């Protein structure tokens, strides 16, 4: 899978690269966790950087709430506690993002609803995502495979 990326900023801190992405809204690094990350943007930037970055963070630039939220291999980013398991974290991101890319290139593009609050916006996308037709499609495919 070939994609183009546009990073906001890469800093060199004591010879280590740190990927920074500016955000004006609420941000959380926990959205990078798990087998299906909710927001894989910064982990993808880390994996794509050459040489590989040793940290990544959102730089929240919201009035009255300016802060860094992220992770790093060592004490590279103000207000961000370093991870003792940076190498393992990068390996987990590589596995998770690789699995997502493999699904996408295989034609798997299911709708993933992470929280019920975001589901209210799905009404506008119903003609595109077809999640409500999933049961009928699976039944039809099963019928065709048994014939």
Language model features with spans:
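RecB-family 4Fe-4S metal-dependent nuclease core
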Residues: 1-147
């Amino acid at each position: 899978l070939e994609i183009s990326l546009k990073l906001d900023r890469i800093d060199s801190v004591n010879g280590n690269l740190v990927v920074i992405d500016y955000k004006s809204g609420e941000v959380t690094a926990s959205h990078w966790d798990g087998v299906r990350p909710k927001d894989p943007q910064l982990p993808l930037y880390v994996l794509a950087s050459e040489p590989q970055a040793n940290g990544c963070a959102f730089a929240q630039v919201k009035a009255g709430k300016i802060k860094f939220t992220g992770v790093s291999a060592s004490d590279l980013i103000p207000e961000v506690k370093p991870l003792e398991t940076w190498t393992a974290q990068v390996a987990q991101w590589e596995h998770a993002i690789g699995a997502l890319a493999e699904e996408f290139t295989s034609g798997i593009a299911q709708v993933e609803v992470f929280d019920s609050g975001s589901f209210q916006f799905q009404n506008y996308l119903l003609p595109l995502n077809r999640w409500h037709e999933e049961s009928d499609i699976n039944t039809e495919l099963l019928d065709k495979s048994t014939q």
